Regions:
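Beta->alpha loop/short-helix hinge microenvironment recognizer with preference
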Residues: 1-391
Length: 391
């Protein structure tokens, strides 16, 4: 049994046979190619030479795929730094929207359409209820992030939202929530349920949905109606997971959700010729960690289920935090609350400068003598990534 294996190791061993048996779609094949070849030299190399001692340093390029476990830290730090400019020193709430598992097959068959519908339903629910004077009576700001996995890499689409605890009323004055989340969870869940199922029904009526695998039966009008009726009868779940009092705590928390993938390397416990063992949370036992073993190709299937559609935007900003509003309205909110504006530490920095700032590593200095490292232009034999496989 092998220890300390990585997701890259798992893909190298099991993906070739998985591809032969299953004929995965192009964006799954591309993701697998990226993971298997990340930092191997397949995406090119950076070569530098010390001016003083002649020491040569070769760094293999990463794949930069948003599904690669080795490529998330740098984008995450850059994104968090950019968000600091729009974080107020006010309460924030982490609200989660989930859908019943009966919808999983039809959502998976129509990922782009029905993931978008999740964002539409969650955002319109928050906007509508926040503007109601019964709850807050203000325009709010929030960020929505789609996750499609549970701890065991099972299919579990849900939306995480980071909601600003306050907003601007009709007179453009700041209205505070009083330190508590301002919307009843039962009301959120009911409104979200109605909006999502209404959009699902509209897409079915307009013949815009596809039906694959276990979702094929929903092509039939009566089966689809039964599905809707069943989902309307169920109590949907929306809940506030965390509350943050102040800007710094929410900033530190954001990165846990923004650039997360279905599973990270540290959860892979072992791999054999036929199986993979990884750590999962057992929510039926107070969230205790336990080990789960699956066939290698099943691990690949589970991982690839969570590759988003091509060019799909997972992190979306709404209300006061939307692109068209945040420059003016967030400045106004900052002035009302007396908050100082954060000056980005990473904006317009080169990659080498960011590495030094984030990790205190100076890649421009020789590790042997401390001399200056200068780029060495690659010759025609240096490997480069194929154009059709670039991110």
């Amino acid at each position: 049994m092998e220890k300390s294996c990585t997701i890259q190791d798992v893909f190298e061993r099991f993906y070739p046979s998985y591809e032969k048996r299953n004929s995965p779609p192009a964006h799954h094949r591309k993701t697998a190619y990226h993971i298997m070849n990340c930092k191997t030299g397949a995406f090119g190399v950076n070569i530098s030479v010390c001016e003083d001692c002649g020491c040569i340093s070769i760094h293999n390029n990463s794949c930069r795929s948003r599904c690669c476990p080795m490529c998330q830290e740098f984008p995450k730090e850059k994104w968090i730094d950019a968000q600091k400019e729009n974080v107020l020193d006010a309460p924030y709430y982490h609200v989660v929207f989930t859908v019943p598992e009966e919808l999983n097959s039809i959502i998976y068959s129509n990922q782009k359409l029905l993931y978008d519908a999740l964002y539409h339903a969650a955002s319109s629910t928050l906007d509508e209820l926040a503007k109601d004077s019964k709850y807050l009576g203000a325009d709010i700001g929030y960020i929505c992030i789609l996750h499609t996995w549970g701890s065991a890499m099972n299919y579990h689409p849900h939306i995480h939202t980071i909601v600003l605890g306050g907003g601007l009323d009709k007179d453009s004055k700041w209205k505070d929530t009083g330190g508590k989340f301002f919307l009843p969870y039962g009301v959120i869940a009911k409104v979200f349920r109605g909006k999502y199922l209404c959009e699902l029904k509209s897409l079915w009526n307009d013949s815009k949905l596809e039906f694959h695998g276990t979702a094929e039966k929903y092509q039939n009008h009566y089966c689809f109606k039964e599905l809707l009726d069943e989902c309307y009868k169920k109590d949907w779940v929306a809940y506030c997971k965390e509350t943050f009092n102040g800007a710094q705590s929410v900033i530190n928390y954001l990165g846990k959700y923004t650039h997360r993938i279905a599973i990270s390397n540290h959860r892979i416990k072992s791999m054999t010729e036929a199986t993979v063992t990884y750590a999962v949370k057992d929510y039926k036992n107070k969230g205790q960690w336990k080990e789960k073993t699956v066939p290698g190709e099943e691990f690949i299937r589970r991982f690839l289920m969570h590759v988003p559609p091509k060019r799909f935007v997972r992190i979306r900003h709404y209300g006061l935090l939307s692109c068209r509003n945040k420059s003016k309205k967030m400045t106004h909110c900052r002035n009302l609350l007396g908050c100082k504006k954060y000056i980005s530490a990473l904006k317009n920095r080169s990659a080498t400068e960011m590495i030094k700032l984030l990790y205190n590593i100076d890649v421009c200095r020789c590790s042997s003598c401390g001399g200056k490292m200068v780029p060495h232009l690659p010759d025609k034999h240096t490997p480069s990534v194929l154009a059709h496989m670039r991110c």
